Amino acid sequence: MAKRKQNVRSKRKVKKHVEVGVVHIRSTFNNTIITITDTQGNAISWATSGNLGFKGSRKSTPFAAQMAAETAAKVAMDNGMRTVEVNVKGPGAGREAAIRALQATGLEVTAIRDVTPVPHNGCRPPKRRRV
C-alpha cells in the first residue's frame, strides 16, 4: 500500500537581532557582491548587481554597486543592525560607491579594510586587452 504524502510547510524566516556586523564587498571587473554577516560570519543579507536586474556590462557600474549595497543594508537594518565594519575585496569599479551607499542608508561604519588578495608571484595574470 502506498504511503500518504505529507504536506511540507515552509518555515518563515526568523529575524535575527544583530546590532554589530561585517559587510563583505567583493568587487570584480564584472559584478559586485555584497554580503552582510554577523561577527561570527553567519550571513544576514546579501545582494549582487546581477540579482537586482543589471545584466551584462551594466553589472560592473558604480550605480549597480550602490543599489546592491542599499538593498543589502535595508534587510540588515530590519534585523536590527546599527554598526558595521567593511571588508573590501577586488579591483572593481563599485568599491567606493558601495561604501558610500552603506553610510547613506544610516549604518555606522566603524572600520574599512582592504582585504584584496595579492599574489606573491603566483599565477600568470591574463594578457592585456587590445581593443
Curated annotation (Swiss-Prot):
A Gene Ontology biological process term: translation
Designated name of the protein: Small ribosomal subunit protein uS11
GO CC annotation: ribonucleoprotein complex; ribosome
HAMAP family xrefs: Ribosomal_uS11
Record keyword Repeat present: no
Function: Located on the platform of the 30S subunit, it bridges several disparate RNA helices of the 16S rRNA. Forms part of the Shine-Dalgarno cleft in the 70S ribosome.
GO molecular function: rRNA binding; structural constituent of ribosome
Family: Belongs to the universal ribosomal protein uS11 family.
Top-level taxonomic group: Bacteria
InterPro entries per the UniProt record, alphabetical: Ribosomal_uS11, Ribosomal_uS11_bac-type, Ribosomal_uS11_CS, Ribosomal_uS11_sf
Keywords, alphabetical: Ribonucleoprotein, Ribosomal protein, RNA-binding, rRNA-binding
Subunit record text: Part of the 30S ribosomal subunit. Interacts with proteins S7 and S18. Binds to IF-3.
Keyword Glycoprotein found: no
